[in-house]
Amino acid sequence: MRLFVSEGSPGSLPVLAAAARARGRAELLISTVGPEECVVPFLTRPKVPVLQLDSGNYLFSASAICRYFFLLCGWEQDDLTNQWLEWEATELQPVLSAALHCLVVQGKKGEDILGPLRRVLTHIDHSLSRQNCPFLAGDTESLADIVLWGALYPLLQDPAYLPEELGALQSWFQTLSTQEPCQRAAETVLKQQGVLALRLYLQKQPQPQPPPPEGRTVSNELEEEELATLSEEDIVTAVAAWEKGLESLPPLKLQQHPVLPVPGERNVLITSALPYVNNVPHLGNIIGCVLSADVFARYCRLRQWNTLYLCGTDEYGTATETKAMEEGLTPREICDKYHAIHADIYRWFGISFDTFGRTTTPQQTKITQDIFQRLLTRGFVLRDTVEQLRCERCARFLADRFVEGVCPFCGYEEARGDQCDRCGKLINAIELKKPQCKICRSCPVVRSSQHLFLDLPKLEKRLEDWLGKTVPGSDWTPNARFIIRSWLRDGLKPRCITRDLKWGTPVPLEGFEDKVFYVWFDATIGYVSITANYTDQWEKWWKNPEQVDLYQFMAKDNVPFHGLVFPCSVLGAEDNYTLVKHIIATEYLNYEDGKFSKSRGIGVFGDMAKDTGIPADIWRFYLLYIRPEGQDSAFSWTDLLIKNNSELLNNLGNFINRAGMFVSKFFGGCVPEMALTPDDRRLVAHVSWELQHYHQLLEKVRIRDALRSILTISRHGNQYIQVNEPWKRIKGGEMDRQRAGTVTGMAVNMAALLSVMLQPYMPTVSSTIQTQLQLPPAACRILATSFICTLPAGHRIGTVSPLFQKLENDQIENLRQRFGGGQAKGSPKPAAVEAVTAAGSQHIQTLTDEVTKQGNVVRELKAQKADKNQVAAEVAKLLDLKKQLALAEGKPIETPKGKKKK
């Protein structure tokens, strides 16, 4: 067989990725041809990719070629995969071809490209979310995944065309993009030029016809699709759960101290990367580790799983010695000072550690030395002489953080002796260009020193076997998988585990008494020692791999030490240690249009947040809303204002406050009787579906996406109130008053559910709602899997008051100036912000009502198969109303670019 591909041919991407599967199954020659070369003699125009079979026949559809390769590998066809392939050909390709032509050939950008794509991208995201599987056709990669990945890659490799709200699509795309066959295919076709590599090929192709305009918006489509997929059986099941109420909740487990695993139950051990004690954490540090882990820990407790959440300050190493010199203190004094600062910051942010410890303890020394001795006796420790930088003026070897210079990889002028902050690459200090001693600023010289190394090559097979068993069925984030795969692909090398320092865990070996363990060897052991300081039964957590699920949260730069160095250490120690099952790594959070910098006064740091006057829960909400899960994200003051005033004040807070106020004002503070109509029953089922979706997302640690489920339920609640108008019905006849009671009772129960769903994200707000509604204790501490009636008729609520305050533009502008952040690129101007925040809640209610009514008009016309022009006119009205509503709610509206069609 011979496969013909072309550089810059989009169809060559999936074909090359699929061809990698067929290697060894058949003799395959791959030839690269020009875009004008006619391979298939009977086609009227040149076309690649082409597969010439041994029989002399040709396959010249990318999908057909991929199918052929998969069949060679023994793939068995299934209906779902075939359905995806049909959809790709009939729905995705027309939209995608037009978008690529607009971008590459015509040079258009932004919404001109993304606008037509939103529907198809949302469909993929929604399908992945619904089936709760990592791939399109199930738990394993299929032909459909390769074909759709190849089709989408040229566009989605640019984060601008992969909307952040499509979390399931992001995760799927990144998982496939990090696989070696896909990476090689991308390198072959795009040649590291990105989408521009397609220009020559696409210029030779006929211009694709643009897809017909959509008759409804994506948000409307989503809404209809979700409701339409609820079967009568779904509704009956949901209503049955609703009617059981609190009886359906399991018995409330008593809280124990210390928290210990229980055989036969779900036992979850959660760690957050240990922050360096000498640094005050900024918002990016907080969301990357402790806050993300806190959300998951709180969720696990709501599920009544035995959950231990721990963290602590990483106190040994060169960074501490350097900070001590700067401040004229001893290392111990520095550790005491900054440990207290860290603890205070996390306390203010509401981080619910079961224990927050430190690494400068006798337990740390004992456990680290024990693991080292076991590695030593088993032959996994090497001795070698290392070339090191020595400062003759200071008469000492310079450990990595005592030296700075120019990065040998990217040229960054302030690179440390261990890692470059700009490119992230690990560095040996002697590789630095123009090195300087951080203490005296003199130029150090190279000298030799004997050190100990962890023999990672000798442990590589054990590591790969463990990864092969662990990662496929786990929730490792795509970036964590990619980072570890990259290290293994390059081959592991012995890793130095000692340093010429005073402040650290002593090395218990003759001849090395003047050295300490390298912080990257013993810092991860800190999780174990912190647990040992929490309970003398620590081995029930850390030497119990069969019964404990270990989740570790971190920023992506910490992945090699948690996914490679620490596992190799304990695998070599052969002492039945619990190994990580799930590594949850974030990308980086930037500040406005730059980076956080304490020295330059740029960005909000943890000790400053409480001085802004903005409550901790608002910070939590916004950081979790923009959590950098699939790509870097940026903190923006303008966006914080918009999200607070729209999502919290006008959406979530407005609904919960109205629900409670209706009970107080119209029904004397007692929940009224509820007589559910078919529409109410359907709403119960829809809320249950959204709740189950929330569970599925959080069980997969998709924290940002699960937050959207909360906001979706509150939006439906607002719409439910607007449509049914209980404030009017309460003044009517008996039937109207009964209807007002049902709507109010349903709404206040939705508010009760939201209070529990909010608990992992906004614990103080959650507690406030539960106090206002006088929620029963069991309902506060257990999150049901279905929407149940927790506030039955006759339940008396407490005093209801607003949950959130509006953020004013002047207030935010002052904070932006105070923290040194310039206006973020692309952010609305102050006048625009005034416009989006000026609308009152009554105006928003009116617009919401109008959108609902107009949506019903459009749906009815479509159901009647009315004249297309009539439908188009009504759709235009609906779009205009939605635009007005988005503006009133403070949601940014993209101005269409380019010329209008005539």
UniProtKB/Swiss-Prot annotation:
Protein keywords: Aminoacyl-tRNA synthetase, ATP-binding, Cytoplasm, Ligase, Nucleotide-binding, Nucleus, Phosphoprotein, Protein biosynthesis, RNA-binding, tRNA-binding
Organism: Mus musculus (Mouse)
Locus of motif 'HIGH' region: 275-285
Oligomeric and partner information: Monomer. Part of a multisubunit complex that groups tRNA ligases for Arg (RARS1), Asp (DARS1), Gln (QARS1), Ile (IARS1), Leu (LARS1), Lys (KARS1), Met (MARS1) the bifunctional ligase for Glu and Pro (EPRS1) and the auxiliary subunits AIMP1/p43, AIMP2/p38 and EEF1E1/p18. Forms a linear complex that contains MARS1, EEF1E1, EPRS1 and AIMP2 that is at the core of the multisubunit complex.
Keyword Cell wall biogenesis/degradation: no
Lineage of origin: Eukaryota, Metazoa, Chordata, Craniata, Vertebrata
Ranges where the WHEP-TRS domain occurs: 843-899
Protein name per UniProt: Methionine--tRNA ligase, cytoplasmic
InterPro entries, per database record: aa-tRNA-synth_I_CS, Anticodon_Met, Glutathione-S-Trfase_C-like, Glutathione-S-Trfase_C_sf, GST_C, MARS_N, Met-tRNA_ligase_1, Met-tRNA_synth
Biological role: Catalyzes the specific attachment of an amino acid to its cognate tRNA in a 2 step reaction: the amino acid (AA) is first activated by ATP to form AA-AMP and then transferred to the acceptor end of the tRNA. Plays a role in the synthesis of ribosomal RNA in the nucleolus.
GO MF term list: ATP binding; methionine-tRNA ligase activity; tRNA binding
